[in-house]
């Protein structure tokens, strides 16, 4: 079983990562998203945590925020043909989705897919467990993540 931590550098994912290390939980890979729009203080924090968790290595995936914000041409829905997703907000969470998709692609591109299921849907390997730092009071955010094995340690620990 491969254990992969999705780490944003934010308070919840950092609390999860450090608690997993402290508890001796297995960690095979740490994936961190870089939108290119992080504040300097966040970048310093990320570097500080990387030094603290050494020798564990962090795979940083760079995202082109500017492209998705203003250049990407939408292909579906009422906005088909329009450019860009605009500012992310609580209803328009494209940035969250983009980061999640990039993390999943990075993780599973290094771990082959299972053969297609009988219904033709591509299924991720079941020997990878992905960990997300979602706080206990936000547990409703986890209800739609049923496609592959995902764990939410902060929720399990009621943090």
Annotate each predicted stretch with a short phrase.
Residues 1-159:
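Nucleotide-activated chemistry modules centered on ATP-dependent adenylation/adenylyltransferase
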């Amino acid at each position: 079983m491969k254990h992969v931590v999705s780490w944003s550098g934010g308070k919840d994912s950092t609390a999860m990562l450090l608690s997993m290390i402290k508890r001796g939980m297995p960690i095979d890979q740490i994936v961190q998203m870089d939108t290119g729009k992080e504040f300097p203080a966040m970048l310093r924090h990320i570097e500080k945590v990387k030094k603290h968790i050494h020798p564990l290595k962090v795979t940083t995936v760079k995202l082109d925020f500017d492209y998705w914000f203003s250049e990407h041409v939408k292909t579906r829905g009422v906005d088909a043909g329009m450019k860009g997703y605009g500012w992310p907000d609580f209803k328009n969470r494209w940035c969250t989705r983009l980061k999640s998709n990039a993390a999943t692609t990075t993780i599973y591109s290094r771990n082959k897919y299972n053969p297609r299921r009988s219904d033709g849907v591509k299924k991720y390997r079941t020997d990878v467990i992905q960990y997300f730092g979602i706080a206990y009071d936000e547990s409703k955010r986890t209800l739609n993540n049923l496609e592959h094995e995902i764990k939410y340690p902060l929720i399990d620990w009621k943090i």
